[in-house]
């Protein structure tokens, strides 16, 4: 009987220790949080890590080389958070794999700007000009939204943020779309009047998204959040105080400055 009582007492004590540990973690003191990223994201997170370190929160980046693993790792509890995808991708992953994960904060939109070899403003585009755009559904839809924002075409409102070429309802300059793989759009710049280029491919081809483009993407172009990148956590973790603090530490002027300087305007803050 005494042995049973001692065992029961030990279980109670252990539970109390565990609860205290969780409370400390929630307050952030001495806690380590792992966040999954893809590619070169270190510079973007440096100011966040520095700010959180002052509060005893150690933010540890876990780098993945593909886009299929971070959500599986998050859902499986291998990491605490991830930050590599936009809402459209997250929703598709949840639909496909039933992941118990959710967005807890917005980060940025990857800019898709208009570039030209010979023009300095979209107002100089002539009737019948050729326009290079990515040919895949997701990127072409964004390119069309950018062309509409630039005043070059008009789209059917019913198409939302994912229009197709068939959704063009007004093309006053009779522009000719040249659809190619997103990675090859820049290669067509000598042969077209303008090209709508993803920021990563612009950088790969020596272009500065903030300085070399003749029309720049904007968060306001889009009706919803499909193309907004995010920080994700396990379902039900949105109120975790440490995670909320990480989101707050990210959504700052310091990170916006990194977007501008280190990434040459490739990323547009989406939390404002």
Where do the protein language model's features map onto the residues?
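Short, low-complexity disordered leader/linker segments with a strong preference
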Residues: 1-33
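Short helix-initiation/N-cap motifs at beta->coil->alpha
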Residues: 61-72, 160-187
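Beta->alpha turn/N-cap motifs
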Residues: 40, 65-67, 77-91, 181-182, ...
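Periplasmic-binding protein-like
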Residues: 140-148, 250-271
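A bilobed periplasmic-binding-protein/Venus flytrap-type ligand-binding module shared by bacterial periplasmic
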Residues: 111-122, 226-240
